[in-house]
């Protein structure tokens, strides 16, 4: 075994790429390390293309092994199971920038598997996983127009930080991942604390500049490995068939794309394509139907793009910077804690907000450690939203990714636990879709949170931008349709407030997207965002003063930390009885903080009263209403507070001499007693005689 190793300094860490020792039967395998965080990346491709396949079957699997952090998995089986949400998001993060780097026409199956085998809790595996993937693909011999670089950028005290540690990110106003080739940015994913557009763009440029050292190192590794490239050539286009397809379908497609309503337009496009295909197959029955479909798709793309570049109105008749018609409603569902219906053209999101207690928070156990998330956002994309049938069940990768993007857009304006001690779950149901449903979810979430009475800092809106570029000519499109997303060169989603950007996601399919183009897109997005915020503010411009009557109201009180055990009781008996009898949820913290949650105000008051009784201190000189619990020859034991008994000596029962206690008292009798003394052992001495002059009993 002859290892080939390449090391370089990258930000605060040393990156090492090694190949030739592990997983040698794969087309390529790279052991990539950043500090003590190490991933094994393997690439395998099938040499033979499956006949009739009309798509590129690339699979990216990212898996975190618990042994990497020195842990044993939980659960009955004690082994890793299905991918977590975090693993799914990382797999998407890697897939997005590498997919456009495979050549057009390449349809051989390729599988990339990234396995985290060692982890430093201060160094997240995402960046080194992307670097390792780029290196493995570059040395595999598989057609790949890389290499690709990757960087994470933080922003602290007005300075950009390259590949910040987990601790540094806690104080950072920005967490931005950027990936690209030597000449082009391909992917951006970020979350920010409402930063100005120029700071966001500066972070993208900074990250792309810094990752050049990665690209250079991978080039050197590729030269040293020197593996022969696959003998693959792009399929030759049948120019005669291209001309026939154009003659038969171009005019019809041009007309079809002037139909504004999506479903009607799709129906007409299908009519045109079917007629052209049938005519070509009638002329030549041996023609490849899939090839015809591909050429019709290419022609469709060309028709739409050429109209936009020529300055004609867009598919639905809008100008490039126009946002579709908006409809905004808050409080649309009667029993939810908060709800909103946000409609932008043919994209619609029904968003609900549910408030819960701290025990409803999501507990995340990953190799980076345990975390608790009080704010959850789930995105659902049912098939009916696009007029189709399909499977309904657990969320797919896309739904998880879109939900996380919307979460990032809102997270910066969420209140702290001290400001609002609730767990919050938002669900966005996409009921109609024609482009930018994740950004509709951002708008709907902002509205639903305010309707629920959540004190978010300010409203947030999101917009999806697109780009069509031919040579030096380009047009930036605001609020793109699904077709414009599919046929365009860039998908550029921006969420933010009036003051700045909270989330930015960018996927670029071509080279040549300059800083100036991105600047224009960000400025155009700002104008669209402010327009949407103005419309949203007409429906609801601030959070409701009161939370819903159906939501649990959380009341917080403080008790002596030494009294926590009294509230819990033996084996939890006291707190269990409290919650069952009052119908409340009670949470105790080590510092003596007690949180009582209930939608019923009277139940909350009763729980508070009983907790105060349990935790109250016996005060010397105070008169209590007590209950006789036991009679003995020398007096009676009286309960004055829950769990606190005192002795009334026979001499303290009455002014006159008492010969027999039972003549004056019986078990269960309520009496007024005054606390005379509490000795060092906590024993309480009571007197009925001394309590008699008191007109009122002390109430605790």
Swiss-Prot record:
What is the recorded function of this protein according to its Swiss-Prot or TrEMBL entry? Involved in mRNA degradation. Catalyzes the phosphorolysis of single-stranded polyribonucleotides processively in the 3'- to 5'-direction.
Location relative to the cell:
Cytoplasm
Mind listing the UniProt keywords for this protein, alphabetically? Answer: Cytoplasm, Magnesium, Metal-binding, Nucleotidyltransferase, RNA-binding, Transferase
Q: Name one GO molecular function term.
A: RNA binding
Q: Which domain of life is it from?
A: Bacteria
Cite the SUPFAM superfamilies for this sequence. Answer: Eukaryotic type KH-domain (KH-domain type I), Nucleic acid-binding proteins, Polynucleotide phosphorylase/guanosine pentaphosphate synthase (PNPase/GPSI), domain 3, Ribonuclease PH domain 2-like, Ribosomal protein S5 domain 2-like
What protein am I looking at?
Polyribonucleotide nucleotidyltransferase
């Amino acid at each position: 075994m002859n290892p080939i190793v390449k090391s370089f300094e990258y930000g605060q860490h040393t990156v090492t790429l090694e190949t030739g020792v592990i997983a040698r039967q794969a087309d390529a395998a790279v052991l990539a390390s950043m500090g003590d965080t190490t991933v094994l990346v393997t690439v395998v491709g099938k040499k033979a293309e499956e006949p009739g396949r009309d798509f590129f079957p690339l699979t990216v699997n990212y898996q975190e092994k618990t042994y990497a952090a020195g842990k044993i998995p939980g659960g009955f089986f004690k082994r890793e199971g299905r991918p977590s949400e975090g693993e799914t998001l990382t797999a998407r993060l890697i897939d997005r920038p590498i997919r456009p780097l495979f050549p057009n026409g390449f349809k051989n199956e390729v599988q990339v598997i990234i396995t985290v085998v060692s982890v430093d809790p201060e160094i997240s595996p995402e960046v080194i996983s992307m670097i390792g993937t780029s290196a493995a693909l570059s040395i595999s011999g598989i057609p790949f127009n890389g290499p690709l670089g990757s960087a994470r950028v933080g922003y602290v005290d007005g300075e950009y930080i390259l590949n910040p540690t987990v601790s540094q990110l806690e104080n950072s106003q920005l967490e931005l991942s950027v990936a690209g080739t030597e000449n082009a940015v391909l992917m951006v994913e970020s979350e920010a604390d409402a930063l100005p557009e120029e700071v966001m763009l500066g972070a993208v440029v900074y990250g792309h500049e810094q990752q050049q050292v990665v690209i250079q190192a991978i080039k050197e590794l590729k030269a040293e490995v020197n593996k022969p490239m696959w003998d693959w050539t792009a399929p030759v286009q049948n120019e005669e068939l291209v001309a026939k397809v154009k003659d038969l379908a171009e005019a019809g497609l041009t007309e079809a794309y002037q139909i504004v309503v999506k479903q009607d337009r799709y129906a007409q496009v299908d009519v045109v394509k079917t007629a052209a295909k049938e005519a070509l197959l009638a002329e030549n029955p041996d023609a490849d139907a899939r090839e015809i479909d591909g050429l019709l798709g290419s022609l469709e793309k060309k028709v739409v793009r050429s109209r936009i570049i020529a300055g004609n109105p867009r598919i639905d008749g809008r100008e490039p910077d126009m946002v579709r018609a908006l409809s905004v409603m808050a409080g649309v569902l009667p029993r939810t804690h908060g709800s909103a219906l946000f409609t932008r053209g043919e994209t619609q999101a029904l968003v609900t907000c549910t408030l819960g207690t701290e025990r409803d928070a999501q507990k995340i156990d990953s190799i980076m450690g345990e975390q608790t998330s009080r704010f959850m956002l789930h995105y659902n994309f049912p098939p009916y939203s696009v007029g189709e049938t399909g499977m309904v069940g657990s969320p797919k990768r896309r739904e998880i990714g879109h939900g996380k993007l919307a979460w990032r857009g809102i997270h910066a304006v969420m209140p702290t636990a001290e400001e609002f001690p609730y767990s919050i779950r938002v669900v966005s149901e996409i009921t109609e879709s024609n482009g930018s449903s994740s950004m509709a979810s951002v708008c709907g979430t902002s509205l639903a949170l305010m309707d629920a009475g959540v004190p978010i800092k300010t409203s947030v809106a999101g917009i999806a931008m697109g780009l069509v570029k031919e040579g030096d000519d380009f047009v930036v499109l605001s609020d793109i349709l699904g077709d414009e997303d599919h046929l365009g060169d860039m998908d550029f989603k921006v969420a933010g407030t009036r003051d700045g950007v909270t989330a930015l996601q960018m996927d670029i399919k071509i080279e040549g997207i300059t800083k100036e183009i991105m600047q224009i897109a960000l400025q155009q997005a700002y104008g669209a965002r402010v327009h949407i915020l103005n419309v949203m503010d007409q429906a609801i411009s601030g959070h409701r003063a009161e939370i819903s009557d159906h939501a649990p109201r959380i009341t917080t009180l403080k008790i002596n930390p030494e009294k926590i055990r009294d509230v819990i009781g033996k084996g939890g008996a006291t707190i269990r009885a409290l919650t069952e009898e009052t119908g409340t949820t009670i949470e105790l913290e080590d510092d003596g903080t007690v949180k009582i949650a209930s939608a019923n105000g009277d139940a909350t008051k009763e729980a508070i009263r009983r907790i105060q009784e349990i935790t109250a201190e016996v005060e010397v000189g105070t008169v209590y209403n007590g209950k006789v619990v036991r009679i003995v020859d020398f007096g009676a034991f009286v309960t004055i507070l829950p769990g606190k008994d005192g002795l009334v000596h026979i001499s303290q029962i009455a002014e006159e001499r008492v010969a027999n206690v039972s003549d004056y008292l019986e078990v269960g009798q309520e009496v007024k007693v005054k606390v005379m003394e509490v000795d060092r052992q906590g024993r309480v001495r009571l007197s009925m005689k001394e309590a008699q002059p008191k007109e009122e009993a002390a109430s605790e």
